[in-house]
Amino acid sequence: MEPLLLIYNPTAGKGQLPDELAAVLDEFTKANWLVTAYPTQGKGDAVRAARELGPRFSRLVCAGGDGTLSETVTGLMQLEDPPILGYIPF
């Protein structure tokens, strides 16, 4: 199993993401990923999570709106060797 970091905004998509989270985690697990899920708590949180946690993972997926994606990319741009990024829009 390879490590994957999932940074997600629990309020994205009118709060629908938490309802879909189990299905998302199930699909990653079936694909042999060991998932660590990180729910953002406010502005700038995805930047910090991507920057501080990103180096520990070979893949990082963010789930949320354009703000979550923007913050995640901002955090990854601060890394010398960032993980591969995936995006699930909500």
Labelled PLM ranges:
Residues 2-90:
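Small-residue-rich beta-alpha loop regions that form the catalytic core of phosphotransfer
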